[in-house]
């Protein structure tokens, strides 16, 4: 929108504004690189291929962002007011209540993207909205029954036990925002209960590390149970999970590949389409004692989906790698 000339305000929660400052510049850079690659290899139907937006557009967009607090009712246009409520999905996510005056009187529209799971860690339950004249709601899993959370957690713990007993590494491809922080919290719970055998846990994603720091700055938004649990460790994630190490630079990431067993490695991208996880897969997929835990949605055509579907071989960084690890 900004690239096309939008100059109005962009209302969001303060946590969303901070996450945008992490995610959008990287996205703009990727847009530019993909357009340059398409032009160099002449495979785009556009002449020339152009990025949807650039890093410069991102900076202009960030300058338009105006953070507002949950529950704060504010005017957005003549006769139109809005209010953000916690959607409980990721830190800063919001349900939008919108009131507008029209020829048929005042109407209320409620809009939301993803809503959080009632039993998810860290985030509170989604806010309950009492009424609406019009509701627009994301519904990806609207027609599905999921197994209980406890079954999932039990399976997660069992896989970690098997990997530790077998001497292999555990690779967890994870999205930088939301899922990585949930995994660290669950690992912390296991550690505090004396159930985590691994002595090395790596969060090998600069973006996930930055997102985790946003979570820490906004931990007042966590649910009461998570606040109480983390509070017993002084609110410090690395005190809650002492084996945790943040790997910020390339050299530290490369050093992990010398570890052949006993480590849990969390890295992006979540669908294994890029990022540091591809290097870790290259060094571990062919090991029969290694485990890969898929913790998020995997789109068709992605390496992550290929693993879920039982691929016996995967091409990573230009090399065919046999899949002998347990997925």
Regions found by a protein language model. Give the residues of each.
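Flexible, active-site-adjacent loop/turn segments at secondary-structure boundaries
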Residues: 28, 72-74, 88, 127, ...
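Basic, gly/Ser/Thr/Pro-rich low-complexity segments located predominantly at protein N termini
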Residues: 93, 97, 118, 147, ...
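Generic long, charged, amphipathic alpha-helical segments
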Residues: 307, 314-327
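Short, conserved active-site loop motifs that form the nucleotide-linked donor/cofactor pocket
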Residues: 65, 80, 244-245, 263, ...
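Short, basic, glycine/proline-bearing loop/turn elements
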Residues: 108-109, 139-145, 237-241, 262-268, ...
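Solvent-exposed alpha-helices and their adjacent loops that cap or buttress functional pockets
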Residues: 102-104, 126-129, 194, 256-259, ...
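Hard-cation-handling environments
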Residues: 159-303, 315
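His/Asp/Glu-rich metal-coordinating catalytic cores
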Residues: 1-182, 188-195, 200
């Amino acid at each position: 929108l900004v690239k096309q000339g939008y100059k109005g305000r962009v209302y969001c929660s303060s946590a969303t504004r901070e996450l945008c400052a992490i995610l959008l510049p990287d996205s703009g850079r990727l847009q530019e690189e993909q357009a340059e690659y398409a032009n160099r290899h002449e495979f785009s139907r556009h002449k020339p291929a152009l990025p949807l937006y650039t890093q410069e557009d991102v900076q202009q967009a960030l300058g338009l962002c105006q953070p507002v607090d949950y529950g704060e009712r504010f005017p957005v246009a003549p006769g139109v007011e809005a209010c953000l409520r916690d959607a409980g999905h990721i830190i800063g996510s919001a349900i939008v209540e919108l009131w507008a005056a029209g020829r048929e009187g005042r109407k209320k529209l409620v809009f939301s993207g993803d809503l959080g799971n009632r039993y998810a860690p860290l985030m509170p339950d989604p806010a309950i909205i009492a009424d609406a004249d019009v509701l627009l709601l994301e519904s990806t899993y609207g027609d599905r029954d999921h197994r209980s959370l406890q079954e999932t957690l039990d399976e997660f713990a069992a896989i970690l036990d098997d990997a530790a007993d077998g001497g292999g590494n555990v690779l967890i491809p994870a999205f930088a925002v939301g899922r990585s922080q949930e995994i660290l919290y669950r690992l912390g719970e296991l550690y505090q209960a004396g159930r985590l055998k691994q002595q090395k846990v790596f969060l090998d994603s600069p973006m996930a590390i930055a997102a985790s720091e946003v979570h820490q700055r906004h931990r007042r938004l966590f649910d009461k149970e998570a606040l109480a649990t983390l509070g017993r460790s002084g609110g410090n994630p690395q005190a809650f999970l002492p084996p945790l190490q943040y790997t910020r630079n390339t050299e530290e990431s490369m050093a992990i590949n010398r570890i052949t067993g006993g480590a849990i490695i969390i890295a992006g991208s979540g669908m294994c389409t890029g990022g540091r996880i591809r290097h870790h897969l290259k060094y571990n997929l062919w090991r029969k004692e290694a485990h890969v835990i898929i913790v998020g949605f995997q789109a068709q055509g992605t390496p992550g989906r290929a693993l879920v579907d039982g691929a016996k071989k995967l091409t990573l960084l230009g090399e065919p790698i046999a899949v002998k690890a347990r997925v």
